[in-house]
Amino acid sequence: GVVVPELVPAFDCPQQNPWHVYDVFTHIARSVEAAPKDADLRLVMLFHDTGKPACKTTDEEGIDHFYGHPTVSEQLAKSALERLKASRASMQRILPLIRYHDGHILTDEKSIKRWLNRLGQAGTLDLIDVKTADLAAQNLARTQPEIEELYRTKALLRQILERGDAFALRDLAIGGEELLALGYRGKA
């Protein structure tokens, strides 16, 4: 039998795309290798592109596209991880990273704080590691500048965390009760 049948369609799925030099399975294997030595992050990489074969389209110029594959990959991963009896904590860490692995993290404070609000500190750091591993397993001639940008993004993220900036309402040093005590009132 096959332990992870969700991977089988990736074996024979080429990626005719300037960003990729490997078929889907080879890309997955190389991204697992490029990921930090953390079981959950390596599982993210194992499943992050499993939805590509089901989403593959080829445009009139012969370029392959995989629109919507993060959502399909997340669904496949959820099914596989449940079958493999992954812990609830692992699934709560892994699935959002698969869902957002193609999301854009810009090297600016507003973008980083948006991701911090969505995924928290650990999740945002994990997402940068996932994106770095993903890019490292693509066409490095094209992706190396993006990898370097992710290093800068991670450095800026660490600065934001060291400063103790608020990135969600719960992080503010003052709340509604304090504002009311100071005399602030809402709309009459």
Region annotations inferred by a language model:
Residues 79-83, 137-188:
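Charged substrate- and nucleic-acid-binding regions of tRNA-handling and nucleotidyl-transfer enzymes
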Residues 1-145:
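Conserved, hydrophobic alpha-helical core segments of structured domains
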